[in-house]
């Protein structure tokens, strides 16, 4: 707040406000304390105006104490509430409108009148202050009819009418104090001033990534001119922001655009004190240049070269390269000023400078911790945008969320409102039916409810005023989690239990394979607890083993446990990348090839879902060169697509599956199943597969993988468990047709026996179930047997499968229990 612009009496009002907050043991200085401060200055215009409406200091004190009362003992620094800050800003705005250089008590009173939601506004309402008359009385006391000189600013610029209609005067806006403060850009503003002070080609162009603060530098220059912090050469200059879209708009006939632009140039040259600011400078190229007519850039070139027209441009690096650099004559008329992305420390300082504006707008308190969290989290997790823009957006949206949450009408008030409406309708119906005694009772009930509603509403409002709404780190984390889908909020008890029991959750779908399940679970817990390396993926794994042991199933189970759906993972079938040129499909087709605009199959999916499980299935099937592209993904957690965009893989789990070495094992008659010495078999499988893996893939690729896991062979007991899982899936499908199927243990053992194949793992079980159960059931259904609503028991008598169809009884188990 600009305390230097306050009169001595207004400064004393703020001091009195602080004293009143201390006297009442309040933790913040609010609008009510400002009002009490005004009453403590009886010689001020504000106090005299209020006294003329029979509002005295004693009455104000009584109302304030009645509305919010005394607080608990408070120790610590007092801060202004967002509403109080808003009042100070409004008072400064009132002073500007009345063309006063300083803010007095009268302006603070006008600010309190305009801010109509605080405790002070309720005090005015309770004391029956006529707001319109009070405002008129203040203006009358000043002897200065409001806005009598409405066009005072326009008189300075009446020699540039066309320019004024097409451009915004940033110096006037800066004088009004409505521009956001510019922090930490002194070096760039100084360089702009140096270029503007040249004799010729005095046209700086601000070049930088979107959102780094290029436009803010032009606004900073306007503020520097207003504050008289510029050299003599730039004093009294006007910075005018010209929008090329506005210049082109409405030019229906040929020559109209050129005439309008020439008129603007003539006015600028005659005025001699205008610096033109063109945001999105690349729009000059081609603007208005249809059917052979010259465009805006060619019209401006002569004046820019001679120094008759001072222009500040702003554009991005890509647009500068595409549009400005290709026109060498235009490029040499502008002097580039590089605007880099600010550091994390500088961004924190920028946000602290903007804090007052956002607190006043959202009427909440923004803590230092929230600002630091916004900068750090946006810098880490929002990789396709730039500071400070993304951090400012994060603070703005989180503040909006907190404000809306705290100002939502509570349920008890809504219930009373609905009850009042209901009673009112019943009363009207009773009157219409001429049941006047009942109507009178309902009227009394309505009055009682309305009184109850007012009391509850006042209690809620008092609680709101007493409670300072603050923006916390957790609010910031919630918003960024909503943006990216990455869970960043504090781990609650339910999620903590879920993470600690992740192994059990995965084992519900994946039978056996403890090593793989444990390794994956540990990686997920490390990431969620915030302990993982921030520059690498959550985890990268190679799953080795013969076919059908659960490698792909584990990836699906992990996706389901993390996202609630096993289709949520990004699956890349490497058998589709058997040719060398197919690698372009991962990151996008090169420039000039068909499909360049479509993006890569992998990069586009990860850009849309940065928090995901990526499965590269059957990696040995792909061309060896395909894996070179994954080197930087595994090491640095990012990949650059063909459009030059960096795609962030730091919040992904990368799983690669392979059957490499399986053929050699088969040749050695070790397929990974059966055998009496399980440990010996597993060691043989492990050594063979790791040896083949090293022969098939380069060491720099394998060295970047977090863990290489060789899956165990499946025992007969595990196969029986898998049969039970598959049968349960079948019963769930049949339950949709109202058929209850029960498969006995003997039948399951026989299915496991028939489906047991040492070469193919668990997949033959699917075929065994189809052959033994599904085929026969389908015949029963199609043969006219009415088995819908009945119980079908599948058993094996030692020779063949038997099917017993019976009516369902109340004791019959549900399909899920079968």
Swiss-Prot record:
UniProt: ATP binding residues: 208-215, 545-552
Which segments carry the region annotation I? 163-410
Record-linked InterPro entries:
AAA+_ATPase, ATPase_AAA_core, Clp_ATPase_C, Clp_N_dom_sf, Clp_R_dom, ClpA/B, ClpA/B_CS1, ClpA/B_CS2
Q: Where is the UVR domain?
A: 417-452
Q: Where is this region: Repeat 1?
A: 6-71
Q: What keyword terms does UniProt attach to this protein?
A: ATP-binding, Chaperone, Nucleotide-binding, Repeat, Stress response
Which stretches does the entry tag as region Repeat 2?
80-144
Occurrences of domain Clp R (ranges): 3-144
Q: Where is this region: II?
A: 471-662
The GO terms this record gives for MF are: ATP binding; ATP hydrolysis activity
Q: Under what name is this protein listed? A: ATP-dependent Clp protease ATP-binding subunit ClpC
- Native source species: Staphylococcus aureus (strain MW2)
* Gene responsible for this protein: clpC
